[in-house]
């Protein structure tokens, strides 16, 4: 009788250890997936960056600004140059 109780308790303890290990592995997998999503999003943002400055972006000359923008001489930021062409 005592050995059956001991085996049952040992089995429950073993089951608890296996389940907690599985849960830890699941949490680690979830962390890896979230990290991968964040890294992918960061890479996508970097891929969309352009070599020119957008409206009100800092600049030192007209060549720094994107198309249809020019560098404002006093404030050193990109402003619209007044053109509409595509």
UniProtKB/Swiss-Prot annotation:
Q: Which residues form the propeptide?
A: 21-50
Where's it mainly located? secreted
Which cellular compartments is it found in? Secreted
Query: Extra notes?
Result: Negative results: has no effect on voltage-gated sodium or potassium channels in DUM neurons. Has no effect on mice by intraabdominal or intracerebroventricular injection.
Protein's name in the database: Omega-theraphotoxin-Hs2a
Q: Which UniProt keywords apply?
A: Calcium channel impairing toxin, Disulfide bond, Ion channel impairing toxin, Knottin, Neurotoxin, Secreted, Signal, Toxin, Voltage-gated calcium channel impairing toxin
GO MF terms listed in the record are: calcium channel regulator activity; ion channel inhibitor activity; toxin activity
Q: Does the keyword Transmembrane helix apply?
A: no
Disulphide bonds annotated for this chain are 52-66, 59-71, 65-78
Family statement: Belongs to the neurotoxin 10 (Hwtx-1) family. 17 (Hntx-9) subfamily.
User: Which segment of the chain is annotated as a signal peptide?
Assistant: 1-20
Q: Which domain of life is it from?
A: Eukaryota
Q: Which GO terms describe its cellular component?
A: extracellular region
The effect of disrupting this gene, in the record's words, is: Its natural mutant mHwTx-V shows no effect on locusts, cockroaches, and mice.
What function is annotated for this protein?
A: Omega-theraphotoxin-Hs2a blocks voltage-gated calcium channels (Cav) in adult cockroach DUM neurons. Reversibly paralyzes locusts and cockroaches, and causes death at high doses,.
Q: What does the record say about domains?
A: The presence of a 'disulfide through disulfide knot' structurally defines this protein as a knottin.
Q: Which InterPro entries match?
A: Huwentoxin-1, Huwentoxin_CS1
Task: Please tell me in which tissues this protein is expressed.
Answer: Expressed by the venom gland.
């Amino acid at each position: 009788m005592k050995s059956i109780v001991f085996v049952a308790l040992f089995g429950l303890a073993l089951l608890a250890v296996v389940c907690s290990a599985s849960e830890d592995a699941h949490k680690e997998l979830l962390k890896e997936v979230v990290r991968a999503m964040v890294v992918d999003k960061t890479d996508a943002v970097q891929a969309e960056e352009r070599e020119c400055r957008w409206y009100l972006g800092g600049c030192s000359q007209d060549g720094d600004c994107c198309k249809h923008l020019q560098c404002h001489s006093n404030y050193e930021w990109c402003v619209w140059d007044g053109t509409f062409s595509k």
